[in-house]
Curated annotation (Swiss-Prot):
Entry-linked Pfam families: Proteasome (PF00227)
Residue ranges of the propeptide: 1-8
Complexes and interactors: The 20S proteasome core is composed of 14 alpha and 14 beta subunits that assemble into four stacked heptameric rings, resulting in a barrel-shaped structure. The two inner rings, each composed of seven catalytic beta subunits, are sandwiched by two outer rings, each composed of seven alpha subunits. The catalytic chamber with the active sites is on the inside of the barrel. Has a gated structure, the ends of the cylinder being occluded by the N-termini of the alpha-subunits. Is capped at one or both ends by the proteasome regulatory ATPase, PAN.
Family, per entry: Belongs to the peptidase T1B family.
Enzyme type, top EC level: hydrolase
Protein name as catalogued: Proteasome subunit beta
Activation/inhibition comment: The formation of the proteasomal ATPase PAN-20S proteasome complex, via the docking of the C-termini of PAN into the intersubunit pockets in the alpha-rings, triggers opening of the gate for substrate entry. Interconversion between the open-gate and close-gate conformations leads to a dynamic regulation of the 20S proteasome proteolysis activity.
Catalytic activity from the UniProt record: Cleavage of peptide bonds with very broad specificity
Localization of this protein: Cytoplasm
Keywords linked to the UniProt accession: Autocatalytic cleavage, Cytoplasm, Hydrolase, Protease, Proteasome, Threonine protease, Zymogen
Purpose: Component of the proteasome core, a large protease complex with broad specificity involved in protein degradation. The T.acidophilum proteasome is able to cleave oligopeptides after Tyr, Leu, Phe, and to a lesser extent after Glu and Arg. Thus, displays chymotrypsin-like activity and low level of caspase-like and trypsin-like activities.
Species name: Thermoplasma acidophilum (strain ATCC 25905 / DSM 1728 / JCM 9062 / NBRC 15155 / AMRC-C165)
Amino acid sequence: MNQTLETGTTTVGITLKDAVIMATERRVTMENFIMHKNGKKLFQIDTYTGMTIAGLVGDAQVLVRYMKAELELYRLQRRVNMPIEAVATLLSNMLNQVKYMPYMVQLLVGGIDTAPHVFSIDAAGGSVEDIYASTGSGSPFVYGVLESQYSEKMTVDEGVDLVIRAISAAKQRDSASGGMIDVAVITRKDGYVQLPTDQIESRIRKLGLIL
């Protein structure tokens, strides 16, 4: 189970004073074979909430659909968005209920309500909130970058550059991570905004990194 969970992805989420930034790369692998170079691993599940996926693609995509439906129903019934902690708790409970036949996934949930939040959630439903988190086979390299360069006082632009550097570090050392980088910024003012690919490419070049 652990081998399945840790293969083929690098995702990251960080909190700043007034924002959350989430990022993934796009490579999809099956053991040593690159199945897809443009896999989607970063999703908007509500106005102010994003989710990243690692693990079995089918399991992860089902959970994304479930969460989108649950959060939309909550918003229609109560006329407010579900708090981020409640989103993480709901997803955690869903996974824990099937822990003996688990969804083979590692997930990040990030968003902003009264404050920015990032939660990492494992296949058994374990949920941990932190100022930053990473999942997938490239996560050790991401944590190396974050531990030395992260600051809660960063601007959004600095935070975007940081997650790009972190994912790029994983791509250089982890053969199961690669391809283009996807980045989303979540703020109270604008909600969930995924940055255009050409903007990410421009930032990568400016930082002197390899596409």
